[in-house]
Amino acid sequence: MDNRPIGLLDSGVGGFTVVKKVIEKLPHESTVFIGDSANMPYGDKSREQIIELTRRSVKFLLQKKVKLIIFACNTATAVAMPTLQNEVEQQIIGVIQSGSLAAARTTKNKKVAVAATPVTINSHAYQKEIKFRDPDIKVMEVAAPELAPLIESQKDYDTNLAAVKRSIAPLKDQDFDTFVLGCTHYPLIQNEFVEALGDKIQIVDPADQVAQYTFNVMRRDGLFSSFDQAGKHEYYTTGDPDKFSEMGRRFLGQADLTSHQVDTRNL
């Protein structure tokens, strides 16, 4: 048994999509989530910048004495996870491996499309992971640099829908049956993706598989909490705590959710 909290990090509010699934799967566990909204988007930054920014969030979570860390950010998973896993004792769980497994299991015609930030796409992390599971699957990748910042700014449905349609335009006439939301921000506007793609396309949200994998790791390593009541949840951001809290309340349905602003630059 281990009563320490689970740590989660993201470049911004997208991590709430993973927090939600983790809370649903592990209701007795406590969590600490930090979103680095002051420095988002990560998707247009250099490898060195992404590693350093992610390292700051990891250090913050370690100060909170977490028992494992979930990189609830595809860009951080693709770029920083290999380096930072060697720097900490706690296991780090990424979203790309889980999302790739779900995509490989879902596709029937062995054609999968992935939308993500430019850095994630340029790393070809999803392509490598999906093909590792099934070399016969064709993976089509599209960079969507405008979506994560747009979601952070909390625009209306029509604005989001237009942006989604622009972003997936390069996939027109491609015969894929499965679409991966390759950025944890994207499930926040999943309805817009459903309308833009049509109801025949299966949409994969890696957060579902991340929560299941986290459960499996904790069972294997004896990390479950001994508490039988609902866990406690803390939320932090390097950006605007009011905007961060608003998105959290809306997506998690926690009417009393509050977040705290932190400065991770001097950790």
Curated annotation (Swiss-Prot):
Binding locations of substrate: D10, S11, Y42, G43, N74, T75, T184, H185
GO molecular function, one term: glutamate racemase activity
Catalytic machinery residues: C73 (proton donor/acceptor), C183 (proton donor/acceptor)
UniProt key word DNA-binding: no
Biological or metabolic pathway of the protein: Cell wall biogenesis; peptidoglycan biosynthesis
Protein name per its UniProtKB record: Glutamate racemase
Enzyme Commission identifier(s): 5.1.1.3
HAMAP family: Glu_racemase
Reported function: Provides the (R)-glutamate required for cell wall biosynthesis.
Any one of the GO BP annotations: cell wall organization
Source organism per UniProt: Lactobacillus helveticus (strain DPC 4571)
Enzyme class: isomerase
Keywords: Cell shape, Cell wall biogenesis/degradation, Isomerase, Peptidoglycan synthesis
Reaction it catalyzes: L-glutamate = D-glutamate
Family: Belongs to the aspartate/glutamate racemases family.
